[in-house]
Every structure is written in structure tokens, then in C-alpha cells.
Amino acid sequence: MKKIFVMMIIASLFAACKQSGPTGENKDLAKVFGDYYQDRLKLYPIEATFNGDNRYNDLLPNDGSTAFIKQAQDFYKGYLDKVKQFKRDDLSEADQLSYDIFTYEAQINLDRFKYHFEYMPFDQFNALPITMGQFGSGSGTQPFKTVKDYDNWLKRLSAFAIWADTAVANFNKGIKAGVVLPKTLVVKMIPQMESFAVADPTKSLFYGPITKLPKDFGEGDKKRLTDEYTKAIVNIIEPTYKKLGDYLKNEYLPKARGTSGLSALPNGAAMYAFSVKAQTTTDKTPEEIYQLGLKEVARIRGEMDSIKNIVHFNGDLPAFFMHMKADPRFRPFKTPKEVLDAFENIHQRMQPNLKKEFTHVPKCPFEIRQTEAFRAASASAEYYQGTPDGSRPGIFYVPILDAKQFNITSGMESLFFKQA
């Protein structure tokens, strides 16, 4: 999701430049930003698909390869050089803001390559194999409306095995360098990979688009696509996911580490400091942010103590937490639909107040969905942006492993407001 967020920033920057001509903004700088945005979509076609741009839906870059990393480094260096030809002090206030956002975003992406994050090519959250499952199910971001859409997915899928081979090679490089994932994460990744390796192609998640073939497709196209999707599942999907699952279980897991944070890795302190900078967009040190966090925890804990006293609970705060977790009154749901309906109720109560709080509100449709079973066990609630033209809704995904254990005191409203 991080990359999607970056694309939103760059898209906004580009749009602002396009709309700012009459106020004296630099048209040459705006062109550089526009070129950057378009070239970035070509470089990262998965991001383009998420962003609703379907021109590159047939492409899947091998983004962990040495060649791609060199290409990406040259891309960021080239555009930084172009932008730095403009003197910031000579720009309008609006262009200075765009200049600062751009140089920060491009430099952060360039600096990322110093730390060899490609040695940990995916985990249980951020994983192309999971994204491929979402795309290939036929109900995600990848469109399946035309014959060309179906062919685009086959072309994109054809590059997946090569990507997976590179991922395994990078995991092995990480083992040699001591840059490996924690065991606690790897054990969650293994069943994810295994869930995709289904022997019967018609039972595969990736057969979903075939079960939803549009009625206006010709019979010849329907037969061809059914045959080609079946072959792709048998020859690409099943063996690739099996290979990833077997590798993680038999080779990588024994080499994975018992520690948890990045700081436990070689050069881990620098990796962590970089990640903090990238995530917070500040120059605060990890220690400064940690101390800020401690202050916030103390403040919130004080408010929790006040609530405990207001409701006349007899006991300390840990006992109060256990009470809220165990009391059946706080677990009223019996089915996943009831959980989703509760979130929809929050949505309906929130909706009339949006225009009071925000100048601009999204025009695209909005949906609340249960997180797909293949990733629910390791997922958190999350929001996938819709497209500006409204052709794809924004989707709030909620993992519901057991509706009867879903607790209303877990912060449903705050979770919904933050994510959705």
C-alpha cells in the first residue's frame, strides 16, 4: 500500500501543476513532473493498475532483478537532475511545495536501494504473490471486462514464474548477508503460498475470471480463454506457488531469525532509521519518535483509567481489558455479514458529516468487503483506493476469522475512520 500512497501524492502533484498555469507557475517544471508521473507508471505497471490506468495491465516487471534496480536508480537520478536544474528560490510558493514533495519522494526511493530490502522480497503483508491472487481472482483491481483484459492478465501472469525465481535468488542472497525475515513471519507466509497451489485448476482462485466470463464474449473466445487459463493455472500458477511454499518451508525457515525488529540485522539500525524517515516524512530519530510514543501511551492510558472509573469497574486496568475482551456483551456478532453490517452502520452515520469536515470528498463508489480467505489470517483491516473516474470503487477490507470473536470494543469506529 505504501507505493499506492506515493502514487496518490504524485498524481495530486501532477494535477496541481496542470491546474496552476494561470497563476504564474513554471510550465517547464510542470512538464517535468508530468513526464515523471507517466514514466513512473511505465516503470511500475502494478501501481498503474492500482491507480486505474489500464495501459500496462499486461506487464509484470522483475523488480528484484539487478537490471530493474539499475533501471529504477537511473530513473530517479535522472529526474532529480532535471528538477534540480530549476532554482527553488525563483519558483512560486506552489511550485516550491511541489518541488519539495518531488525531491523528497524521489530521493527517498533512491536511498532505499542502499539497504538491499530486495533481500527480503516479500512477507505476509507486502507480497506480490498475494497481490497476484487478488488480481487473478477476477474480483480485484485487475479488470476483466473485455477479451483484451483477459489476454492482458495472461501476459502479466506469464512473467510471474521469472519473478518468483528472482525472489528465491534474493532470499538466498539475504541468507548469505544475514538479512533474513523473522521466523514468526515466515510461518505465516508458508500457508499463504500453499493455499494457491491447488491441483484441480477449476478449484483455483485464479479460475475466478473464467466463472465470470461476460455473456457478450463469442463462443470461440470463451473456449480459447478457458483453455489458456486452465493451462496457465496448471503450468504457471500451481508450480510457482508450490515452489515458493516448499522453498520457504524447507530452505528459508531454518535460516530465518528468532529476533523481530530490523535493528537485529546487519546495518539494521541504519535500515530502521531510514524506514522511520520514509514512513514519517520527518527528520526525527527513532528514539525521539519512541519517546513521543511513550508520552502518547501514558496520555491514552490515563484516559482509559478515567473510563474505567466512570463505568465503576472494580479492578486494575489489565483486569478491565480482560473484562472487555471476555464479556459476551461485547461480542454480539454471529456471522461475518453482521460484522460488515456494523461497519456499514458506521459508514452511514459518518457519511452526512463528511462535507462538514472536508472541502473535497471522493466521488467514486465505496464498498465494505470481508478480506479474502487466502490472506485473512495474516491481514489487517485496510483500504484500497478507487479510481478517480469511479469505474472501480474504494474498498474497505475487514479480516473476519471468527465473527463470534469479533469484539466491538476493539475500536471499530476509529479503525473505520482511519482506514476507510
Regions flagged by a language model, labelled:
Residues C17-A420:
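N-terminal maturation segment of proteins
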Residues I4-L13:
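Sec-dependent N-terminal signal peptides
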